[in-house]
Regions:
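C-terminal helical subdomain
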Residues: 147, 170-222
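Conserved NAD(P)H cofactor-binding loop of Rossmann-fold oxidoreductase domains
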Residues: 55-60
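Active-site helix of classical SDR
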Residues: 87, 122
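Substrate-binding pocket helix/loop in short-chain dehydrogenase/reductase
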Residues: 63-64, 71-74, 163, 181
Length: 222
């Protein structure tokens, strides 16, 4: 049994990951602003840690001319700076356990999307941060660092917010916006967060399942 901390655990993919890991009898710590936590001002919530999962995320959509600096900062803070702050804060515990850092990235890291400058930039940052952290932490400390990059997820708060924001910014109907996005997915449907969570739970059953993934970003859905 491992001690695993999941950020963004109150809903969406983070909650699905929390539930899947708890079902595998891990000791799981949910870390979320809805629980009174702040990933930009981390407080140590445990005395041992085997796995840190950086899953907290936010997306704000708008045209460049309308996008405020405040919105930019919010997206970059949660999606990129939060990874830096949480990993740095929990590094001593991860060094002690020779643990694992798993970052939830996105296919948006390498796929430009209209009205999504901040989100794409933040996920691009999270992508290269994952590779850089692996370079710095694996050989020096024995810490495995890798990422999972899902496509659009089904039924999450972020996905619903994306649909609503696309309607407002593009002037489309909600039905057209949803179909437009589905047309871009090879299997023609959004990925249920539970499937991603089950895959992560399998990888984290034993470090031998994932230690050779250090420095890798695994796509989930296309």
């Amino acid at each position: 049994m491992s001690t695993i901390l999941v950020t963004g655990a109150a809903k969406g993919l983070g909650k699905a990951i929390y539930n899947a890991l708890e079902a595998d009898n891990h000791e799981v710590i949910g870390y979320d602003r809805n629980f009174g936590h702040d990933i930009l001002k981390p407080e140590i919530a445990c005395d041992k840690l085997d796995v840190l999962i950086n899953c907290a995320g936010v997306n704000l959509i708008d045209w460049l001319e309308n996008f405020t600096e405040e919105k930019w900062d919010e997206v970059m803070d949660v999606n990129a700076k939060g990874i830096f702050k949480m990993t740095q804060a929990y590094l001593p515990l991860l060094v002690e356990s020779k643990g694992t850092v798993l970052n939830i990235v996105s296919n948006a890291a390498h796929m430009p999307m209209t009205c999504s400058l901040a989100y794409n930039a933040s996920k691009g940052a999270a992508h290269i941060m994952t590779l850089q952290l692996a370079r710095e932490l694996t050989k020096k400390h024995g810490i495995t660092v890798f990422g999972i990059a899902p496509n659009k997820l089904k039924g999450t708060g972020m996905s619903d917010a994306i649909d609503d924001q696309v309607v407002k910014t593009r002037g489309w109907t909600k039905e057209y916006a949803q179909q437009y996005q589905l047309n871009g997915l090879l299997c023609g449907e959004e990925t249920p967060p539970e499937r991603v969570a089950e895959f992560i739970a399998f990888l984290l059953q034993d470090k031998d399942h994932h230690k050779h993934l250090t420095g890798c970003i695994l796509p989930y859905g296309a």
